[in-house]
Amino acid sequence: MSAGSGRRSKWDQPGPPTTTLLLPGVIPAIIPFTAGAFLSPPEIAAADATSEAVSAPSGALDAAAAVAAKINAMLVAKGKIKPSQNATEKVHVPGKAPAAAKSKDDLVVAEVEINDVPLTCRNLLTRGQTQDEISRMSGAAVSTRGRYMTAEEKAKIGPGDRPLYLHVQGQTRELVDRAVNRIKEIITSGVVKAATGSSPTFNGATVTVYHQPAPVTPVVSAAPPKPQFQSGMHYVQDKLFVGLEHAVATFNVKEKVEGPGCSYLQHIQMETGAKVFLRGKGSGCIEPASGREAFEPMYIYISHPKPEGLAAAKKLCENLLQTVHAEYNRFVNQITSTAPMTGYAQPPQISSVSMQPQYYPPNGYQTGFPVVQPPAPQPAVQVPYVVSTPIASPVPPPPGVVPNMAAPVPAVPTCYPIPQVQPPGLSLPVPPQGQKRRFTEELPEERDSRLLGYQHGPIHMTNLGTGFLVQSKMDGASVRSDTVVVKERERDRQLMPPPGFPVSAQKEPEEKSAAGTLGVAEDNSIKKLKTSDKTFGLVAYAGDSSDEEEDHGVLKNSGWSAGYQYPASQQQQRPKPQMPFWMAP
């Protein structure tokens, strides 16, 4: 096809005249593009200007130049390639490539270590969505650098290896501060959640921010904001648990760790420049997030701007805790060693009380020394000691009663209970003795009320002298002689009325002659005495009773106090005497 023909296709090859029009040093219109190639737009523009005769490839060159310029700008902005010197001298789009280079030199970089934060918090900070949110909020770029390392791996860390941290960079310090504060809030919330959950694997959030100042630039105004950025920096943090949660209550753990007036912790702060204080249960430190003490056991919180200072403060705190533990062990050993001695000192006091006399007489005997209340004495111990003292009585006993005379009580045919007189040494309870004394003291009143024997019949039926002789014989058997008893019996016979049978009338003069020497006043007194003594156990009088009394005289003298009485058959067989008319009731 000739050059003057009509329409041409883009596939048409240019003729020789067109090749002669190409200037030396001008790049071809279509060149292969590589990632590292750098196309200069001025050269492309010069080629377009010199190839005015060739109108076919002009559109393709413009498109290639535009694409190359865009790609070069993107690569320069990302730092993948560096612009050449001739390109900077022939800038047709002023301000783009030099602006990118200038922004890279003035970037403020900060690093936040998140290797030791709780797992949930670490996972949240390494997520791309969280980092994009922080970048949009602050305007600074956030990226993850390093890798997670355990304590053993940290000890064996290489020169080019670093623990996990966040890389923050921005145009100004304000943007970086904003991003760092947001990261701090996320870490703080994660620490509070971990403390609430009492995670045993959490050793405290160790957050370190390193501020990398910009290289030396002619602008000096960037230096003054440096202290402001450092004021918001995080410190390297760590904690040491005290480990005395179950200590004895008398051992004040907080005071032992802090020292007098917190002197121990203040000494560590002065030596290392770190911030050291107690936190956790029983520390008295109120957490700002929860408004109360932390749920964790008591621990020492340490923070320092540099890892070296943190290590020095941690070592001093470990030495302090070792001293506190040793002191607590000595305290516990002292308590366990003194406990048996304290318990052994008590038995001498108890034995001293038991050495006091345990018996006290019931009559209120007072000793010469203060009386110590002894334990309740056994009943068997009190019996042999009662013999020594008589029992006081509010009413004196009758004069005829001899307390130390023991005599058996005869069985009388009466319905009244017969008091038994026993020596005080054999009477155990006091109340029965009082009842006996009251009973014997009431007997004279009963005898006085029936002095003459007029109960329900005549005198010779009620005042015979053969009835109640228990008390009188018991009282006077040991004192009176046998002759006195015989005389009293004869007087009783003389004072009795004349019997109704002739036999008794014949014996009456003999009895009167035997007792004729007695006076009338003496007879009356004896009669009153005998009637007062003989009120119980009355027996009917018979004419022939004198013979029976003589037959039983020996028994009456020797054994009347032993409870002798006439057989009931003889008493029932005796006929009743006829009563004179003048003695009828």
From Swiss-Prot:
Keywords recorded for this protein, A-Z: Cytoplasm, mRNA processing, mRNA splicing, Nucleus, Phosphoprotein, RNA-binding
Cellular localisation: Nucleus; Cytoplasm
Domain of life: Eukaryota
GO terms of molecular function: RNA binding
Pfam families the record matches: KH-I_KHDC4-BBP, KH_12
Basic and acidic residues compositional bias, start-end: 485-494
Notes concerning its domains: The C-terminal part is necessary for the interaction with the PRP19C/Prp19 complex/NTC/Nineteen complex.
Similarity-based family: Belongs to the KHDC4 family.
Role noted for this protein: RNA-binding protein involved in pre-mRNA splicing. Interacts with the PRP19C/Prp19 complex/NTC/Nineteen complex which is part of the spliceosome. Involved in regulating splice site selection. Binds preferentially RNA with A/C rich sequences and poly-C stretches.
Record-given protein name: KH homology domain-containing protein 4
Gene: khdc4
